[in-house]
Amino acid sequence: MMTGGDTGRLPSKGIGIVGYGQSKYAKHTDRTLLSLLAEAARAAMDKAELTKSALDGIAVCSFDLPPDNAVTLAEQFGMSVSWAYLGTAGGAGPVASVINAIRAIEAGHASVVLCLAGDAYDVAGHYRMMDNFNRALRNYGAPNGFGGANGLFGIIQRKHMETYGTRRDQLGRIAVGQRASATLNENALFRSPLTLEEYLNARLIADPIRLYDCVMPCSGAEAVVVAPLDRAPSGRGVRVLAGYERHNHPVGEIAPLRGGWELFREALYRDAGYGPPEMDFVQAYDDYPIMVAIQLEDLGFCPKGEVGRFLAMHSFSFDGSLPLNTNGGQLSCGQAGAGGGMIGLVEAVCQLRHEAGPRQVKGGRRGLVSGYGMVGYGHGLSASCVILERGAA
């Protein structure tokens, strides 16, 4: 698939991620969103060895934040900023926020940017959010019995299975492999091992999607600090080699088996100087295993329609042949609203700093992080991706 040219190319590889942090995840909590975001922000600044006074930019992605926004969050954090960004791309927004923070720094609008993502709600809060997600869903989906993302992705998975012969036992290898990594992650909501038999026999949710295809809505927050790499603690900066975003592709297609990644993947790998074989891990947006599979196809890890065979050939735990969502991903950690779009980014930085402890990918040098979001009437509207590389020791 040809790309749309150089549109979106990052201007510099001298800017990257110098710190990362995560709040405690919880299925139920009485904590406020502000406290969760603050916990993640403090952790990220500690990792960056920076104080609040060094920050002059802020980016935030959250469904639960309105009527507050990035500017009011800066006020609540006691920050004076020259650049503020409010993400609007759902699960693709956090990766896009880092891309735009790099552009802002390169343009001189900021020097150090705190990027945040998270939400504070349970299952009931998740459904309240979906009721007001966008006008298309409210006006056209809900009156016709559309009950949210499970129904749409059930259609997409069925379509993929019937079009290409993809099987549930192949898709299940994603959930099982990620759960194996989650058993070593103290912040994952689900840490018990998951067998393929348990995956296949779980209760039906939206045919053919079953229980372990779905994420658990939860509360939590993630943060990264974006800055010139010479601001990073010695040897612990993470380069952003390339990054792209795309919105509303394919135009007008209902339940598509592709997304915006296919339009920019050639430019992504060209800019990075590396392709899929050189990725030591992949942190893919995993609201459902079928979407991970589609991302692997669209990002060129296997030809379109052959992901079932690809999945059958690989193992996906942190020590597998293709380490995938090495903290367990949203399928095991939970989906903290918009934080689900940053959980993979934070894990990637952790891996590249070789700070992942027992789930460390051996010799991890570079990896890919993708985002996907704004699932409304017929398809997700937004796709994003970055390629990261470990800094010099």
Residue ranges of model-derived segments:
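Acidic, glycine-rich active-site loops and adjacent beta-strand->loop/helix elements
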Residues: Q22-K24, S62-L65, G90-G93, A117-D122, ...
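Short glycine/threonine-rich loop-to-helix capping motif typified by GTGT followed
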Residues: L65-A74, G252-P256, D286-R309, G320, ...
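Active-site-proximal alpha-helical scaffold in enzymes
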Residues: A89-D119, G151-L184, V224-D230, Q335-A356
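Extended C-terminal subregions enriched in glycine
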Residues: E266-P289, D298-F301, Q330-A336
